[in-house]
Amino acid sequence: MASVIGIGAALYDILMTVGQYPTEDTKLRAEQTKFQCGGPCATGLVAISKLGESAAYLGTVGDDMFGASVKSELEKYHVDTTHVAVKPGMNGHSVVIINTDNSSRTCVWNRGDAAEPGPEDVTEETLAGAKYLHVDGNHLDCAIAAAKLAKKMGITVSMDAGGAYPNIENLLPLVDVLIPSEEFAKKVTGCATTQEAAAELERRYHPQILVITQGSKGGFIWENGKEVRYPVFPVHAIDSNGAGDTFHGAFVAARLKGMTVAESCRFASATSALKCTRFGAQQGIPGYEEVLEFLNTHEGVIVHE
């Protein structure tokens, strides 16, 4: 069985690169077009698999070309799809515009109308053998049911907290490893500063591990009431799409390999940086040995706010 079971978004991305962001109501020729799969949970699982740990996706896909591609891509990267059900309707998909001039990305997405997985899709059998349950806040009812069962089974629950979806606060108390973006942390808590938000998340939800991500600034571990910053690795970024999702998957993979929280953040930061040097949210994710080689030849930088 897989070491990590994931429940959350698995999307089909149409990726287009441009030399400048288009002005509204104009036409602009793309430099490149690529078709790929994405979504926070799915991309995190691909990262885990590419880094040498076993992963499985529990969810649904549409019976359209988007859904077929999502399932096929997961299987290509050795993510188990035994518990993926094909449902009538359109799979979630997005158009991602990447500005190669400044490496920004703009995403327009459609959730699709294929039925989502529900609590009834989660059983002890589906979670058996897992060490981690990885969620991203999508398919919330299913994720909550799975997290409750995971707690009973001694499975660690990790969360890529990027979207402050309605009723997300019902999932947060069940999370052991909480890694939100600073935007999520501030929005959920209503705090003015990221540090205040971290303290409030800890007070409310008591995660065992709390790491706040801050994009190009890196981020910090919130430990004993203070921040411990982790390094970033400056690179020539050409595609940041999926970088955050890669960080989350790499963090879980590092923990499975026995790394400390600080070591896991450093490893995840390096993995994310390498991903940014190539196109593709999932295709661009490096392998384990490549990350180790990168760490041996590159010094990280601590960015202070």
Predicted regions and their residues:
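Conserved phosphate-binding/catalytic region of the ribokinase-like
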Residues: M1-I5, Q195-E305
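Glycine-rich phosphate/adenosyl-contacting loop at the front of the ribokinase-like
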Residues: M1-T60, M65-S69, K76, A237, ...
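A glycine-rich helix N-cap at a beta->alpha junction
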Residues: E73-P88
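Conserved phosphate-binding/catalytic loop of the ribokinase/pfkB sugar-kinase fold
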Residues: V84-V86, V96-Y132, G137
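Active-site glycine-rich loop that binds ribose-phosphate moieties when present
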Residues: A114-T123, D141, M159-N167
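Conserved phosphate/ATP/ADP-binding segment of small-molecule kinases
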Residues: A147, K151-S158, G162-R229
